[in-house]
């Protein structure tokens, strides 16, 4: 095709104006189906949330076209004056949200934020302490298949068997024995508050850095409804989705300027090249939303809803690890009912209630089977569910699980169908992206 012809112009106009449904109907269909799933199912996966239209707009903006290696004012590419504005806004808003001096908003995920901290604070072979994955920790805190377990020497602490709370005596004992370089607090399945002051005291006693991974509860911290890692932590990381209700991504926070420089170097050029500027802009939008008074109301509702859900499930005859929750999530221990997490997840999915199978402390089952499910309230709270709705959701969960216990792994199809109808009645009352 020769340059400058009418057909060339038409092709270019089509490239810049054609809708997705025209150019790629297969992907458009998958996206439409996912929208329908989100609209009509009750989302209880603790690590998921629903972002605003504004966040979607920022993430789908022309900023996706821009390469911007480096940091604001110190880029390796020209034409970065406007993406610098977006990143500087994200940094400033993050610092205001968490009351800290320095923020790196470039990590593409919470896992990469954690890797950046490890790279900055440790050398391969160094020892660190983290919560055991089976007790509610995270893969990046030393699980054998993860780079954190391959490059470094993880030592895991756990929870007390009698109450499933962090065993701080064990943390102190292991710290004195192993003299770790870093001690981590945080995880993906721990429903209680953390004693950050005690962790810092233990870290100081052995000359370790204290690192908080607050990926799950950062939004509650930002709202002032959960203990803050600062001033106790040397560094904190978080994802920007989950309770922060932003785009999928990560972030590193600190009050130590010297450490901040190390973290910046670890992320770029250590782990990443060009940052995702469209995602960083969406982070800035979400942080701006979280600075508004309405966000504190939302975060309080998340916590109230979680307590209502946990209480309802306990009243239905099921165990919640540690006896309840202080944050947005809970683990339902299914062992006394003879159920597996895998079967429970599948049964609830058939009723259009989405959750995930999850190990419970001292779980005898394999990670692919598990003895529990993890439930969280952020996403359904975003769509407007309150305590009354979550009490109903808890009752629906109990009905499905009871049917599973009565009928075996295939579940009770009659109960599941009836619950599904009630689920749709609920979601229809609280529409999203309509």
Swiss-Prot record:
<dbReference type="Pfam" id="PF00464">
    <property type="entry name" value="SHMT"/>
</dbReference>
<comment type="similarity">
    <text>Belongs to the SHMT family.</text>
</comment>
<comment type="subunit">
    <text>Homodimer.</text>
</comment>
<feature type="binding site">
    <location>
        <position position="133"/>
    </location>
    <ligand>
        <name>(6S)-5,6,7,8-tetrahydrofolate</name>
    </ligand>
</feature>
<dbReference type="InterPro" id="IPR019798">
    <property type="entry name" value="Ser_HO-MeTrfase_PLP_BS"/>
</dbReference>
<keyword id="KW-0963">Cytoplasm</keyword>
<dbReference type="GO" id="GO:0035999">
    <property type="term" value="P:tetrahydrofolate interconversion"/>
</dbReference>
<dbReference type="GO" id="GO:0030170">
    <property type="term" value="F:pyridoxal phosphate binding"/>
</dbReference>
<feature type="modified residue" description="N6-(pyridoxal phosphate)lysine">
    <location>
        <position position="242"/>
    </location>
</feature>
<dbReference type="InterPro" id="IPR015421">
    <property type="entry name" value="PyrdxlP-dep_Trfase_major"/>
</dbReference>
<comment type="pathway">
    <text>Amino-acid biosynthesis; glycine biosynthesis; glycine from L-serine: step 1/1.</text>
</comment>
<dbReference type="InterPro" id="IPR015424">
    <property type="entry name" value="PyrdxlP-dep_Trfase"/>
</dbReference>
<dbReference type="GO" id="GO:0019264">
    <property type="term" value="P:glycine biosynthetic process from serine"/>
</dbReference>
<dbReference type="GO" id="GO:0005829">
    <property type="term" value="C:cytosol"/>
</dbReference>
<comment type="pathway">
    <text>One-carbon metabolism; tetrahydrofolate interconversion.</text>
</comment>
<comment type="function">
    <text>Catalyzes the reversible interconversion of serine and glycine with tetrahydrofolate (THF) serving as the one-carbon carrier. This reaction serves as the major source of one-carbon groups required for the biosynthesis of purines, thymidylate, methionine, and other important biomolecules. Also exhibits THF-independent aldolase activity toward beta-hydroxyamino acids, producing glycine and aldehydes, via a retro-aldol mechanism.</text>
</comment>
<feature type="binding site">
    <location>
        <begin position="137"/>
        <end position="139"/>
    </location>
    <ligand>
        <name>(6S)-5,6,7,8-tetrahydrofolate</name>
    </ligand>
</feature>
<dbReference type="InterPro" id="IPR049943">
    <property type="entry name" value="Ser_HO-MeTrfase-like"/>
</dbReference>
<dbReference type="InterPro" id="IPR001085">
    <property type="entry name" value="Ser_HO-MeTrfase"/>
</dbReference>
<keyword id="KW-0028">Amino-acid biosynthesis</keyword>
<keyword id="KW-0808">Transferase</keyword>
<keyword id="KW-0554">One-carbon metabolism</keyword>
<feature type="site" description="Plays an important role in substrate specificity">
    <location>
        <position position="241"/>
    </location>
</feature>
<dbReference type="InterPro" id="IPR015422">
    <property type="entry name" value="PyrdxlP-dep_Trfase_small"/>
</dbReference>
<protein>
    <recommendedName>
        <fullName>Serine hydroxymethyltransferase</fullName>
        <ecNumber>2.1.2.1</ecNumber>
    </recommendedName>
</protein>
<dbReference type="GO" id="GO:0004372">
    <property type="term" value="F:glycine hydroxymethyltransferase activity"/>
</dbReference>
<dbReference type="InterPro" id="IPR039429">
    <property type="entry name" value="SHMT-like_dom"/>
</dbReference>
<keyword id="KW-0663">Pyridoxal phosphate</keyword>
